[in-house]
Amino acid sequence: MPKEWYISFHGGDEKTSLNNIHVYSTDGKKLRKALNKKSVPEGITLRELRGFAFGPDKNLYVVNAYFEYSEVLKFNGALNKDGRHDFAGVFVKRHTDLNPGIDHPFNVAFDCNGDLYVSSQNTSIVARYHGPAGKHGQPGLPMPFPQSLDPDLNLPPGTFVPSAKHVSNGLVEVREAIFAPDNNLYVADRAADCVRIYEAHTGHFLRNLVSGSDQVDRPIHLLLSPDGRYLFIGSGGTDSILRHDLRQNSTKVFVAPKSGGLNGPAGMAFGDDGFLYVASRNSNEILRYDTKGGRPSSKPFIKDLADNPEFLMLVG
């Protein structure tokens, strides 16, 4: 099967809101919706989908971010006869007492052990949940606090990286969290104008990788280069993309402010064609930039989207 682009959108209750992951061909043609809504049971509503990832079990995990829902849904990784993913269950569900940490979640990431990490905007934490294999606990339930956290702190169950309300090196306004090749967790802190690094297994705060002095301004999305050398940072305050060299510990502007019409950099992904694809959230476009020098293509890859694009992934 040829590779395809999966794109999530802001969603909501407007007529133009797109509350599904939409599929596009590698030449920008709209193909279909990725998630089979007919398979979703009554009582579950897809609204404001954000980050999504294929888990270690090959199934598709999707953030259902609307604050009243605040959950991670699981869909079969294998496509049905219509080329869609059928609903498989609610993997992580918000609960006022047992799981209050997941609140308006943003993205999901799996660690090398197959456990799931979820960043939540309203609580400004990254929470950790037992992965689908359930090696040490029931899949989807909050995991114990890492050893770096004081057990006497009144933290939501499953907290891996706490908010700045609880610890000095905590998160002020969390957005995307991803794992690097060194297995450490890189977290965009939008309001603090920095990307923070936490040790993978202990949750120990290591350092701020980049900050305002490196021209980081309201970072939201993160992406690692295929070789793991560079970290790309969407800088929302300047409508630019920075590239941090993890070996040299140096940061440069890779995509200049508003280059190619960039307005609200959101999800980023590499294509197989030598381009970096970027969701331009406020202009409802998917843009392309040369991976060598950050030069924009002469025209948008996809334009006139009905809703604000959020996350994108090349699948196949």
Model features per residue range: what roles?
Residues 1-33:
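An edge-strand/N-cap motif at the start of beta-rich repeat modules
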Residues 2, 16-18, 40-57, 95-113, ...:
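Beta-rich, blade/repeat-based domains predominating
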Residues 4-8, 59-62, 115-118, 184-187, ...:
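Conserved beta-propeller blade signature
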Residues 10-12, 65-67, 121-122, 131, ...:
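Short loop/turn segments immediately following the C-termini of beta-strands
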Residues 19-22, 71-74, 124-128, 193-196, ...:
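A short loop-to-beta-strand structural motif that recurs across blades of beta-propeller domains
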Residues 25-29, 76-80, 130-135, 199-204, ...:
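Short loop/turn segments that connect beta-strands within beta-propeller blades
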Residues 30-43, 86-99, 141-168, 204-213, ...:
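A short beta-strand motif characteristic of beta-propeller blades
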Residues 281-316:
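Blade-level signature of beta-propeller repeat domains, shared across WD40, Kelch, NHL, RCC1
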